[in-house]
């Protein structure tokens, strides 16, 4: 879809991974949410591993280096306390993969709800299928929904409890970034999207479509 950055995509994470994977999207993970915690892009959480470039989002058995999290403003408690909350989430989830390369965003909106712990999942073949479906969706459904609640409505209409996902949207200089983490059938899905001169509603609509595709194709 016109305006979307190439790094828009979807990733499925599991606490048990046998193989190193290249996540489609390059070196950006603008927002990160986990188990109700939400950090804005002011938080830089870099993946550190021997012989690995953290900006490529390559996934492996790693340790994590937490760089200082800067608050977007004095009132932005989501940013100031995110490090401890995310670290606590890692203790429950087992492994987390993230690299952040964008600064200066302000938090536009955030909805936080509990997430279930993810279960093991064979990601490689499923991720490839989802990326192909994503390309089709972006070509065939370019329309913009007028409500910010599209994602919630879509999931509720499909019988998916909205308590199983969390999302946040940030914006700067005409660019918007949306990150959604959702628990589907015991799996953890991460949708990360960036658009230039596109609305928050558009990002949410595309995220909802992408999540539904994932839900329909999970084993």
Where are these regions (language model features)?
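Structured C-terminal helix/loop/strand segments within mature extracytoplasmic catalytic/sensor domains
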Residues: 1-4, 20-21, 27, 131-219
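Active-site SXXK
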Residues: 9-11, 28-56
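Soluble non-cytosolic domains of exported or imported proteins
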Residues: 28-33, 37, 58, 62, ...
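Short, mixed-charge aromatic SLiMs
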Residues: 58-75, 145-160
